[in-house]
Regions:
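Acyl-thioester C-C bond-transforming condensing/cleaving domain
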Residues: 1-2, 16-45, 61-62, 68-136
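Residue-level detector of conserved, well-ordered beta-strand and adjacent loop positions
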Residues: 7-8, 83
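Short glycine-rich phosphate-binding loop at a beta-alpha junction
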Residues: 47-54, 109
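Residue-level signature of catalytic and energy-coupling elements of molecular machines
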Residues: 7, 48, 89
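Short polar catalytic/cofactor-binding loops
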Residues: 9-14
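Glycine-rich phosphate-binding loops at beta-strand->alpha-helix junctions
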Residues: 55-60
Length: 136
């Protein structure tokens, strides 16, 4: 089994719901943090094999891929998204460690991102029937 090491850690500032960061989407929040992490850790952007990101309140799609494309990571870097409530960022880090230990990747960037100001609004199914009536 290959050894895995954590070589750096960063986070964005904390902002309240609808506060100063409320206009930023998750890729706009995460990309600068990832860029700074890589620039200060001694690794190169081209060395990164995988980006693993947890996002529990996503609107769908693949947030990790969107974040990878918004950052300075090479376009070839895959984005793996985890939809997990509570400790999802830690799970992303643990999955990154397992990818390295298994020899599937050499360098993984991993963590979590949320924007409660931009979370999707989900309606119960009965509201769908009111908002979009079905005409038979």
């Amino acid at each position: 089994m290959q050894s895995a090491y954590i070589v750096g850690a960063k986070r964005s500032i904390v902002s309240p719901i609808n506060g100063p960061l409320s206009s930023l989407k998750i890729n706009e929040l995460a990309a600068p943090v990832i860029n700074n992490l890589i620039e200060t850790s001694g690794i190169k952007f081209d060395d990164v094999d995988e980006l693993v990101v947890s996002n529990a309140l996503g609107a769908g799609g693949n947030p990790a891929r969107s974040i990878a494309l918004a950052s300075k990571l090479p376009e070839r870097v895959a984005g793996l998204s985890i939809d997990r409530q509570c400790v999802g960022g830690l799970d992303a880090i643990l999955l990154g460690i397992k990818l390295v230990q298994a020899g599937s990747a050499n360098v993984v960037v991993a963590g979590g991102v949320e924007s409660f100001s931009n979370r999707p609004i989900r309606l119960a199914q009965e509201y769908d029937k009111i908002l979009v009536p079905y005409d038979a």
